[in-house]
Amino acid sequence: MPKNKTHSGASKRFKITGSGKVLRERAGKRHLLEHKSSKKTRSLTGTVVVAPADAKKIKKLLGK
């Protein structure tokens, strides 16, 4: 049986920590920022942990 290929789109979007948590960037900060408040754009910075239900699927796509 051949190995499963890593999903290249998922590998660009998600990172797995040493403890096994899946991290992602927040959506909504690429463009059309003019009408969004400074408070909103600041809150969209940084990474967040993915929900456990989604993390299982993502790990499968990444071959972990």
UniProtKB/Swiss-Prot annotation:
Q: Which GO terms describe its molecular function?
A: structural constituent of ribosome
Q: Per its UniProt record, what PROSITE patterns does this chain match? A: RIBOSOMAL_L35 (PS00936)
Tell me where on the tree of life, at the top rank, the source sits: Bacteria
What Gene3D superfamilies does the entry give?
4.10.410.60
Secretion signal, residue range per the UniProt entry: none
**Where is the segment annotated Disordered?**
1-45
The record's listing under SUPFAM superfamilies reads:
L35p-like
Q: Where is the composition biased (Basic residues)?
A: 1-15, 27-42
Any single GO CC term annotated in Swiss-Prot or TrEMBL for this entry? cytosolic large ribosomal subunit
Q: Name one Pfam family in it.
A: Ribosomal_L35p
Keywords noted in UniProt: Ribonucleoprotein, Ribosomal protein
Coiled-coil regions listed: none
Q: One GO BP annotation here?
A: translation
Family the entry assigns: Belongs to the bacterial ribosomal protein bL35 family.
The identity of this protein, by name, is Large ribosomal subunit protein bL35
Coding gene? rpmI
